[in-house]
Amino acid sequence: MHFAMKEKHENLWIAQRQGRAKDSNDRTQDSVLKMMAMAGEGDVTERLKELNIVPLAISYEYDPCDFLKAKELQQKRDDEHFQKSPEDDLINMQTGLYGYKGRIHFQTSACLNHELDELKELNLPKCDLFTAISETIDRHIHSSYRLFAGNYVACDLLMGDNRFTAEYTEEEKEHFEKYLEQQ
């Protein structure tokens, strides 16, 4: 990774997890950062600064795997021994790649090097430092997510109120409700 970036001047993209969290609440894993900090010069923050980490949030209007996630959660609820099959994983990957996502928004944050310097100044134990860096990345990603009309409609439907009606039209609400019915 360090060689590809420093010597070959290439950019790399690393997913936060081994896949999406069922509730879409993805969190950066400390172990990924530990792997990234294994090579390079200097202390942990210096090695990570060499990588010029830029958090990226990818927001989809629709999650193509929503019905698959719901099905799996229900199966796990109904059968504590339920395990997804390899075929289920392939279907999930295929659906995630090719399924309907609606509008897609990519949002990058600024490079984290300045914040890594600030975290270094705290003199945290190494384990706590990795956690603090993960939380910093997550904060940037979560604050960069784009919410679409369906997100607001879903929240209002779930909560049984009209708190976010200013964020969507009646037509968008009807469209989202129709989408839900088709799932």
Predicted regions mapped to residue ranges:
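Membrane-interfacial terminal anchoring regions of lipid-handling membrane enzymes
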Residues: 2-12, 18-183
